């Protein structure tokens, strides 16, 4: 991505640029255009870092689309939709391929800082931060499950597990590329530890729509990938 404001105005970024501005306008109508764009430039720079192969702008776009789809069918609107969208922007904004990194905590801190600059209502910003932190475990407590935004982002972030076979396989290859420095056997064991818990749960997803429409494909994809890793 071209750095600075030139990249912000490049053709491929038009849709994301417009989406960021719209998401900000829904919760911070009095934010200055300069501040909105400064934060947006920083976010897009992060999402285009060269070490990202899966956790990149394509992932951001896919999760935003999944958030919108789930909000539409589940009747999640207003501030709940806004929280889900903003959390999506920040949920992998900090991404380091390092076992000692605390990406979600650092992303949540970034969200709190940047939303405070707009500014966004503190209670709404706190909800965004909570959703970002949820993505560390890809699971929700009973209390978190009562928040529609947290449920939507939980499922949207896991949409790729249910993707068509070609996209799911591409996702698996992209994650492997991010961890190319890890030996094959060690990676296979660690990756299996990440994926297997989704299969042993009663449900991969939390929303009614995702359970009905995404879950069967997700379980097929997960089982196939775990078998491949075992080979």
Walk through the language-model features, giving the residues of each.
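An active-site-proximal "capping" alpha-helix that borders the catalytic cofactor pocket
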Residues: 63, 102-118
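Phosphate/oxyanion-binding active-site loops and adjacent basic polyanion-contact surfaces
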Residues: 55-60, 103
């Amino acid at each position: 991505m071209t750095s600075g404001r030139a990249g912000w105005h490049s053709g491929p970024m038009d849709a994301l640029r417009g989406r960021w501005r719209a998401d900000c306008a829904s919760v911070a109508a009095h934010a200055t255009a300069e501040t909105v764009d400064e934060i947006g430039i920083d976010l897009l720079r992060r999402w285009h870092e060269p070490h990202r192969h899966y956790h990149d702008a394509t992932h951001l776009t896919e999760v935003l689309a999944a958030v919108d789809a789930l909000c539409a069918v589940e009747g999640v609107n207003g501030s709940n939709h806004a929280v889900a969208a903003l959390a999506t922007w920040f949920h992998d904004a900090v991404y380091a391929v390092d076992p000692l990194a605390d990406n979600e905590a650092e992303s949540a801190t970034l969200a709190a800082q940047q939303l405070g600059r707009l500014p966004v209502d503190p209670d709404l910003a706190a909800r965004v931060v909570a959703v970002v932190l949820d993505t560390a475990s890809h699971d929700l407590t009973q209390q978190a499950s009562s928040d529609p935004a947290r449920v939507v982002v939980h499922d949207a972030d896991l949409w790729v597990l249910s993707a068509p076979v070609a996209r799911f396989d591409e996702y698996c290859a992209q994650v492997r590329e991010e961890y190319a420095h890890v030996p094959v056997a060690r990676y296979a064991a660690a990756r299996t530890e990440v994926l297997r818990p989704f299969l042993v749960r009663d449900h991969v997803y939390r929303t009614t729509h995702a359970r009905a429409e995404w879950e069967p494909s997700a379980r097929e994809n997960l089982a196939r990938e775990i078998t491949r890793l075992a080979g």
